[in-house]
């Protein structure tokens, strides 16, 4: 009995020491089975308090591929969300654009809901949680893929990877948000910040229509600092749009009419202003590209003309010094036949 108590006491001391280490600034080793339950650092708790939030408050995540940014936003006592911290994404697979099919090594883009069932405390990449790909939108287009994660270990094959220290804190923040009674953490994944200037730079990209669809959700958050609700109808993302009875929308069916949208007027004004900037930027880019193409063409034509002049001068000079066209060869004259090869005698002089 004494031995058993001693072992239990020793185990408890290890747990306390490990949790204390995590709380003081370190993180548990990958070998620890308790790494998923490690406490938030004291500095993290202080920062949350100073911004008017707490671990149990709701949170939202935004990712930007182009700049490798992973943002965590927390709801404050005012009801709106504030940026808590921006982490650097170690790596993600593929290029800008959504994931289409299993094995394409693309990291997803779009709107995803992280739920407790997507958390993986036993990840071989320190800690991880699933993005929830494919979501309702992805399935409407027949997109395939599985186990698209946010994880540690700083390596990626279709996922978003973070440092172990970063994923330890992010995982704990998500866990505590669930513990506070919030059933979902919304994750918004973008190729870049959805400004009209950035969109204009990719106006010829085949994904431009998809990105412009995502922009409405981006704009709604920028205006209200509240995560928009999202759903899918007519095979596109829609935001803050519900049926009167609150039932889910059908992904390929017609969208219901919009009503009681408090952001609609402000959103329309923002979109109109952004659209004007977008068109101006696209026109400016097209003009620059046309000028560059004309300059390249002019340079190529100038080089060709210079070469032609050089060739002509070379031929002219060569002609002056016999280096032009060669004279036609003379036809050799054959000796007359000798009738067997003996010499023909000269005729005798007349009158002799």
Model-predicted regions and their roles:
Residues 20-23:
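C-terminal motif of bacterial Sec signal peptides marking the signal peptidase cleavage site
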Residues 103-261:
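Exported/periplasmic cell-wall-interacting domains
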Residues 25-28:
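Bacterial signal peptide processing site
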Residues 65-67, 88-94, 187-195:
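Acidic helix-start/capping segments at beta-turn-to-alpha-helix junctions
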Residues 76-92:
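Short Gly/aromatic-enriched secondary-structure transition segments
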